[in-house]
């Protein structure tokens, strides 16, 4: 089948849910037996989000092939079976970089390089390249219609219909129908104006996804259809859901996937949404109640920084038929106030990744508390490194143990810069990134959780466990349960005399899905349940 293209745009406000809409539509089309791929186009000039502050951008999602990408790719992978790559996310910066490189090589034969056709053609090439082998390619255009930055992207997707025809392209516009409390009314004017902006560019949306906090009455759908020039059946309300995993079911109930395959002339089987119904049932009505897990981090004021992590913990709850309640604790606050009171009612503690010295001593204090009070502990990336620092200081009595990331003249750097990173000067795209194999020691907590000896997980870091301290740490009870054999790097550490204590250098959250929870999160949440019931 010739690949069909679905372009998803957003209007009125940012963060309107285009990524979730794209991911949910992908899940529905997969349920109909179609091969789906997804792609995110970002209008910013950065080459990728790898060097952007978590407070500005939120989480950086890492693919298996080592791309640092937008967090929406996390939604795509969690909701679908698509294996995404570097091709699945591109930015204005990447496009201009590529076009300028071609111009310097003389590829344009002395022509004047312009936004149209050169920039837009480059964008179209990247979209087509990513779509190879798929029945349907869902392409989300970042930003909001009306932004200057988005114009070249919108022009590129406009040309797709000219190039490929109406039967092979579809425009879905996500918009807002706000409720004005003082007037007691829903308002359609923002949606009308957003569609007007799209039509000025030359794009007539085929389907409108109308976000609202309340049900949209039929007469209002009729009004939107009339003023926006779409069939009333294609005005699809998307009322705020209790949980994001209900969105595919809500969109199916409104027959979004039915309208999409009809407009694209695709014959498919009826969708089987039983797995999604089971997920929603567990999330909304868990059989084993609730566990409370503390996330002790440094970016807690913007929880989007830990998006994949919070979702992976939810998946662990789904696997154990319980709800996971998260308490975000600022590690700097622990440094200022002390640990007392912060973790006393928690069933488990997780210390996530991060960069820089700020807040790290608070993380060490939280780890020591979890170790001494036998509370299940999970350390990821920097969290694993701080667990090694804590163990070296308080169990091995290496008082000045630290990471060379924070103290260059550190007397005992139990965590140090990786050898291949010592000659690196540029920040962007130069970390240890993507999937690497790891061998697990038989009988360890990690081995039991995975039920496998060989695994592969995704990484994003420059610093690693210092092998010079292997002997003293293992002699004092630290278990090195996961090793990257090619370079003899320690990837997983554990403690034996503890209910559940594990640190990993990789990011397991990037591979967890609601329909396939990650083994470590399943095991960790199970330990939290046991801890809760033992209290």
UniProtKB/Swiss-Prot annotation:
Record's protein name: CTP synthase
Gene3D superfamilies recorded: 3.40.50.880, P-loop containing nucleotide triphosphate hydrolases
Family, similarity comment: Belongs to the CTP synthase family.
Reactions performed catalytically: UTP + L-glutamine + ATP + H2O = CTP + L-glutamate + ADP + phosphate + 2 H(+); L-glutamine + H2O = L-glutamate + NH4(+); UTP + NH4(+) + ATP = CTP + ADP + phosphate + 2 H(+)
Example of a GO cellular component annotation carried by this entry: cytosol
The protein's role, per its UniProt record: Catalyzes the ATP-dependent amination of UTP to CTP with either L-glutamine or ammonia as the source of nitrogen. Regulates intracellular CTP levels through interactions with the four ribonucleotide triphosphates.
Binding site for ATP: 15-20, 72
Species assigned in the record: Pelobacter propionicus (strain DSM 2379 / NBRC 103807 / OttBd1)
Residues binding L-glutamine, per UniProt: 354, 382-385, 405, 462
Ranges where the record places region Amidoligase domain: 1-266
């Amino acid at each position: 089948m010739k690949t069909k293209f679905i372009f998803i745009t957003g209007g009125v406000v940012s963060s309107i849910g285009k990524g979730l809409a794209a991911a949910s539509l992908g899940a529905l089309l997969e349920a109909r037996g179609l091969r789906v791929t997804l792609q995110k186009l970002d209008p910013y000039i950065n080459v990728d989000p790898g060097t952007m502050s978590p407070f500005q951008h939120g989480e950086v999602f890492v693919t298996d092939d080592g791309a640092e990408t937008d967090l929406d790719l996390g939604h795509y992978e969690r909701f679908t079976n698509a294996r995404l790559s570097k091709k699945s996310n591109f930015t204005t910066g990447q496009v201009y970089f590529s076009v300028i490189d071609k111009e310097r090589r003389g590829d344009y034969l002395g022509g004047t390089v312009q936004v149209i056709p050169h920039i837009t053609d480059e964008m179209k090439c990247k979209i087509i390249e990513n779509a190879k082998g798929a029945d349907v390619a869902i392409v989300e255009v970042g930003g909001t219609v009306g932004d200057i930055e988005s114009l070249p992207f919108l022009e590129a997707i406009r040309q797709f219909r000219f190039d490929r025809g109406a039967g092979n392209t579809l425009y879905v516009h996500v918009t807002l129908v706000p409720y004005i409390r003082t007037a007691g009314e829903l308002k359609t004017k923002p949606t009308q104006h957003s569609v007007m902006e799209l039509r000025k560019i030359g794009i007539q949306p085929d389907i409108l996804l109308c976000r609202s906090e309340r049900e949209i009455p039929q007469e209002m759908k009729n009004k939107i259809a009339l003023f926006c020039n779409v069939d009333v059946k294609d005005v699809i309300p998307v009322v705020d859901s209790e949980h994001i995993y209900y969105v595919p079911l809500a969109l199916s109930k409104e027959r979004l996937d039915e309208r999409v395959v009809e407009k694209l002339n695709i014959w498919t089987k009826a969708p089987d949404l039983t797995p999604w119904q089971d997920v929603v049932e567990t999330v909304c009505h868990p059989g084993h109640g609730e566990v409370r897990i503390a996330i002790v981090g440094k970016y807690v004021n913007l929880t989007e920084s830990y998006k994949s992590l919070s979702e992976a913990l939810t998946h662990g709850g789904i696997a154990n038929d319980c709800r996971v309640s998260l308490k975000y604790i600022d590690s700097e606050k622990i440094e200022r106030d002390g640990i007392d009171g912060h973790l006393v009612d928690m069933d488990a503690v997780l210390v996530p990744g991060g960069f820089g010295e700020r807040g790290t001593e608070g993380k060490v204090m939280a780890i020591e508390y979890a170790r001494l009070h036998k509370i299940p502990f999970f350390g990821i990336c920097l969290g694993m490194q701080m667990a090694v620092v804590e163990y070296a200081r308080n169990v091995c009595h290496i008082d000045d143990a630290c990471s060379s990331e924070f103290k260059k003249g550190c007397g005992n750097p139990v965590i140090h810069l990786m050898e291949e990173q010592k000659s690196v000067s540029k920040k962007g795209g130069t970390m240890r990134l993507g999937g690497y194999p790891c061998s697990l020691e038989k009988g360890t907590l990690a081995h039991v959780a995975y039920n496998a000896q060989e695994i592969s997980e995704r990484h994003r870091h420059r610093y690693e466990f210092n092998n010079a301290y292997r002997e003293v740490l293992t002699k004092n009870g630290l278990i090195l349960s996961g090793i990257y054999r090619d370079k003899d790097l320690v990837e997983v550490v554990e403690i034996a005399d503890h209910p559940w204590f594990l640190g990993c250098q990789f990011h397991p959250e990037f591979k967890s899905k609601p329909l396939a929870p990650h083994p470590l999160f399943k095991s960790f949440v199970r330990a939290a349940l046991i801890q809760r019931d033992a209290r």
